[in-house]
Amino acid sequence: MNNELIIKGKKAKEASYTLSFASTNEKNNGLLKISESLIKRCDEILEENKKDLEKAIEKGTSNAMLDRLKLDEERVKSIANAVADVVKLDDPIGEVTSMFKRPNGLRIGVQRVPLGVVGIIYEARPNVTADAAALCLKTGNAVILRGGSEAINSNLKIVEIISDALKEASLPEGSVQILEDTSRETATDFMRLNDYLDVLIPRGGAGLIKAVVNNATVPVIETGVGNCHIYIDDEADINMGVDIIVNAKTSRPAVCNAAEKLLVNEKIAEEFLPVAIKALKEKGVEIRGCEKTKAIVNDINLATEEDWGKEYLDYILGVKVVKDLDEAISHINKYGTKHSESIVTKNYFNSEKFLQRVDAAAVYVNASTRFTDGGEFGFGAEIGISTQKLHARGPMGLKELTTNKYIIYGNGQIR
């Protein structure tokens, strides 16, 4: 076991105990100092981010992934503002969600408490570093971060700034830490740090999620993989459908709630596909379609079986013509990742059937999948989008970073 992990694990465990009973004011003060420090030291962050970008460009990283990695003054301000916004959110810690009285006079309550020490393993998104730190701090959790090697310089600087701010706020050392060793061996050891981690949350592509699920002995909450579909029903509004798929695919193609597949009912395909594909190509999207799609719009690439299950995270879209709603639902439930799925239709019964039968964390009617986000749902910031069913599902905000403690009041009862 890597010695860095043991040292940081012990520090995090100690910090989590103190954080568990820190007052809301103390935690909010720490968050405000973090936000202020990120803005004050923006130039330091950008200098380190420049190093990461130069290395990524040398490696031939895609433009979409470079966009996730890149920071500028506005993005740093946005990160700082997101931290400050967490101050405005209600503190769930200590909340008694229910209280009931037993026939023997015992009063039993359910209270929200921190999870303890949260491990987060993620890829090339420096904003996750600050977001995760803020959410964990607000909920009284210590956090150990393991970012991708692509963003190591940016992440180290952000955590340095956060640590300095927490020290100034008199919050415990070890509340927010990051692993400097980004090797796979250390990552695997991190996934097995049961003595110190209470939960592990991976954020990234399918490869990362699979590696964590296969190797972790620490309890895992899966997040992020989004093979999201837009289904155009035979009773869809054509213009609405085009607007939705263009937005869902191109607004930020490298995020998990971007659309990766377009399914089109055969009754509307000849009218819809030429318009939609033209609009998508104007945005630089490569189309990989089924044979029926190619028969309607010839100037595309043929999709393979592998395409239907793939999360591209790029300007690529798989397109398939389906017989009807039932085939669309069957296809989504077979190839989807239980993230976000959408139907475009004017038919109420078709929309209700889609909502009921599609198995996903977020299911939409006549809207882009890009709204699957804690902020857009009104929850505030999020730690990720859970695609599993146990502990949390969908956008994970503050409440999802808590667990229950039963508190029992008696007056001498014995059994």
Swiss-Prot record:
The keyword Transit peptide does not apply. InterPro entries: Ald_DH/histidinol_DH, Ald_DH_C, Ald_DH_N, Aldehyde_DH_dom, G-glutamylP_reductase_CS, Glu-5-SA_DH, GPR_dom. Coiled coil: none annotated. It catalyses: L-glutamate 5-semialdehyde + phosphate + NADP(+) = L-glutamyl 5-phosphate + NADPH + H(+). Its EC number is 1.2.1.41. The keyword rRNA processing does not apply. Keywords: Amino-acid biosynthesis, Cytoplasm, NADP, Oxidoreductase, Proline biosynthesis. Gene3D superfamilies: Aldehyde Dehydrogenase, Chain A, domain 1, Aldehyde Dehydrogenase, Chain A, domain 2. Catalyzes the NADPH-dependent reduction of L-glutamate 5-phosphate into L-glutamate 5-semialdehyde and phosphate. The product spontaneously undergoes cyclization to form 1-pyrroline-5-carboxylate. Belongs to the gamma-glutamyl phosphate reductase family. This is Gamma-glutamyl phosphate reductase. It comes from Clostridium perfringens (strain ATCC 13124 / DSM 756 / JCM 1290 / NCIMB 6125 / NCTC 8237 / Type A). The lineage of its organism: Bacteria, Bacillati, Bacillota, Clostridia, Eubacteriales.
